[in-house]
């Protein structure tokens, strides 16, 4: 969902009053060093490095003050997004599922770091590089919604089970909305590296 004021205005009309969400289906997930196919006819494939937290025990009605007790660890997601499809869905008023759930569009990993190994999960530098050139550098401290906000909100009525994962949302710096966006969208042959300080680097290769 929305995690920064830096996303383009046609993706977010205003900052929501509470965390928003969508689902990444299991069928779209891929691993570290995965080769992800850019579907034919798609030209606006964007990158979104995101911090993921993994639930360690069942949470229902969790409070912000105790939220971190439910978190087992953290990892990285590159929330690959087909803007061709997403922008059409946004324009029609529907949620953007299709452009985020194409097979392979959920690179995840390469490992889960236990939460006790992270001194401050709200002060981690996140970067995204394409072919060795840095495209993005942001800090988790700039996120609107913290892990505690997200878990309290979604566990209010829905039981969150051990093993469930929440990706904490897109930072600013993605290709969409930039003047040279057409040059920045991912193309076959591109190697994308999403890194989060203290966690690891997740690498993905785009192919035809």
Task: Map each language-model feature to its residues.
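Single conserved hydrophobic/aromatic residue that forms the stacking wall/gate
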Residues: 1-5
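Active-site microenvironments in enzyme catalytic cores
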Residues: 6-134, 207
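Catalytic-pocket segment enriched in acidic/His residues
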Residues: 83-208
